Structures are given as C-alpha cells and as structure tokens.
C-alpha cells in the first residue's frame, strides 16, 4: 500500500493548518504514539503512519523510541505489537531498496 501524495501530507501533517506549529514528522510520531496507546489494534493505520513518518524524515530510531516510550503507558504487549508492525514496514522498505538496486 502506498502513501498519500506530498501535498496532502503537507496539508494534514505539515504546517498548512497551523503555521509555526508542529512539523509533519513530529505530528506523525505523535500519531504513532497514539496508535500504540490504543494497543496497536489497527494494523493498517499503524503501518501507514510508519510509512508516512519515514517519508516525513523520521529515522528508524525515532520510530522505535516513540513506540518504546509508550510501553510505560500502554504496556509491553502493545509495544511489542507496534514494534512488530513497524519492523515489517522497515523490512519492506529495505526489500524495495534491494529491488531498485540501491
């Protein structure tokens, strides 16, 4: 599954609505934290959020730290599930780069 076009990302997660506010990467990491807090129950939403966060400049470390921080509040099962889903996206990303010859 792909990601939304850049102009939509900028509108929904950038500073189009709130000039001088949070950048897209931060908004998406907060969204990822919220999805983890809900128990990482919505696989598709969590995976899409990881993809969008990566496109917005989040590193693997940003994603792992965001999810791990939520273990304090959401518990280890939610953190583990979210990390598994995030890792599957990162693995797909790695496989795509191999296929593209990068």
Question: Which positions does each model-derived feature cover?
Answer:
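Short alpha-helix boundary/capping elements
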Residues: 34-42, 58, 74-75
